[in-house]
Amino acid sequence: NIGLIDDSFRQNSIYSEQFLHILKSKYNLSSILKTMKTLGVLQAYIPEFAEVVGQMQFDLFHVYTVDEHTFKVVRNMRQMKLYEQKGFELEHELINKIPKIEILYIAGIFHDLGKGKGGDHSEIGAKTSLNFAKRLGMSSIDANLISWLVRKHLITVSYTHLTLPTNGCVW
């Protein structure tokens, strides 16, 4: 019953550990997240996610809704970690040196959750992701790193468009 996922549930350390375990698991993370969304679990556990489900992005860079774009970002990060792809050898090497991959995945999930709220979506998402990471019981250092990654994610977008203008796989 989705109604059981309330503030008490979301603040329970057992469920926080289970969510982090999902992020670190060997299984197809984007498929798991999509299934959670389909069942309403993701929106119940991360209420901010509910606000972007089906939300169109009206710009030159995005062709997917915010939620679908988010799943593609997570999928691409996961594939970059698991498989060395031609042209992305350095990225594959670097992502595999990240000691806490869940930090990157959480930043990926939250990077656009501030859209549609008015104001700078990066700043809104940074605050939201910081609160979420703290709720999960993550250290202050990890929570602040997630928040910083969300706040600065447009730098990587600018870099990507400058260096890989034909790569529209997540937009």
Please describe what each predicted stretch is.
Residues 160-166:
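Conserved small/polar residues in nucleotide/adenosyl-binding loops
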Residues 39, 80, 135, 153-156:
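Conserved, well-folded catalytic cores of nucleic-acid-processing
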Residues 4-121:
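Acidic/His-rich, divalent-metal-binding segments that scaffold phosphate/diphosphate chemistry
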Residues 103-136, 142-150, 154:
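Extended, hydrophobic alpha-helical segments in both membrane/secreted and soluble proteins
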